[in-house]
Amino acid sequence: MMVHNYCAPENVTAPPHVSRVTQYNKRGIRMISKVTWRVAWESDLTNGDHAELSDFFKSVYGATGAFNALPFAGGRSWAGARPELRGIAYDESGVAAHMGVLRRFIKVGGEQIAVAELGLYGVRRDLEGLGIGHSTLAMLPVLKALGVPFAFGCFRNELRIHFQRFCRNGKGAIVDNVNIKSTQPDIYPDLPPTKIEKKAAVILPLTETLDRWPEGVDIERNGPEL
């Protein structure tokens, strides 16, 4: 049986993380942009922060379909479960990238385990080279300080290549065809209260090794997706 000692928020700190990424101006000229990462607890964000993130998500997720931008209306900066912690990248144009984190217990093959769930991935569309790998690398010291054995996140197929690159050399593992059971983010009279989706998931070892991850492809969140 695993024993988990969670860190208090004040024990979780991160040094400034600066990335240099490629952009192109309106003339197609290659430029290098400096991006600075901020790690913020949810209760430290202001209404202005949420409004700025809301606009960011509407732009990023709306590009894949107007329906995907709807959860972020009215200054809302989350779609399902609300993050506990956020990694936010800024450049001279504002929010450049985002990754949300939420500690929770999930069930994997019927076995309960504590994880730091990753979600709300986003990169501004005009940036090139600031992928999920950069986001994960910037957040890794913080994730390791949270006192949970693994980080876990589901992802769309378009993000597979980014996670595959990051997981090289044993940094993590990708599990395909996982059956994820989640609650709906709200009450919908015409829908059941839970849903099951088949997705791919990434597992990152934090305080345990990958061989300690439970076997099984059935995962229960016991809550909405981050």
Curated annotation (Swiss-Prot):
- The kind of enzyme this is, by top-level EC class, is transferase
Q: Where in the cell is it found?
A: Cytoplasm
Q: What is the taxonomic lineage of the source species? A: Bacteria, Pseudomonadati, Pseudomonadota, Alphaproteobacteria, Hyphomicrobiales
Protein name stated in the entry: Nodulation protein A
Q: Which NCBIfam families match?
A: nodulat_NodA, PRK00756.1
What is one GO cellular-component annotation here?
Answer: cytosol
Kindly state which keywords UniProt assigns to this record, in alphabetical order: Acyltransferase, Cytoplasm, Nodulation, Transferase
- Tell me which stretches of the chain form a coiled coil: none
